[in-house]
Amino acid sequence: MIAEFAIFNASVLIVDDRAANVQLREQVLHDTGYTDITTTMAPASVCALHSTHAYDLILLDLKMPVMDGFEVMAQLKAAGTDPYLPVIVLTAEPRHKLQALQAGAKDFISKPFDLLEVKTRIYNMLEVRLL
């Protein structure tokens, strides 16, 4: 069993192209008790960030200009730094669920979010990831 403090100290990367979304997600995680949170609005930087920091969880928006979440996951898989992609994808398009899971995401959250669901999915994934 993983201690709760280990889960709240897990490293989390938030990826979204909109500053308001990044700030909201970061605030929710901070308010919940998470302490090691990194954010980026540059999806092209995710692979390099993950290879340097080995995040325990990546909270990834799917719909972003220039490079979408599917492309980010493809780059992460191709880099091979972590065979287990610790990705939860976020999107307003529930029809992308299967495609996202097939691309390597471990979980999927549809917009609009229920905050309790988001917190629970993040906690549960980190609990499994840190075993």
Task: Describe the predicted segments one by one.
Residues M1-L13, E26:
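Non-catalytic signal-transmission and effector/linker regions of two-component phosphorelay proteins
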Residues D16, D61:
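Active-site residues of response regulator receiver
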Residues A19-T38:
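Two-component/phosphorelay signaling modules centered on CheY-like receiver
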Residues T39-L57:
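Acidic, metal-coordinating helix/loop segments flanking the phosphotransfer/catalytic sites
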Residues M64:
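Receiver (REC) domain active-site loop signature in two-component systems and cognate sites
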Residues F113-L126:
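C-terminal output helix
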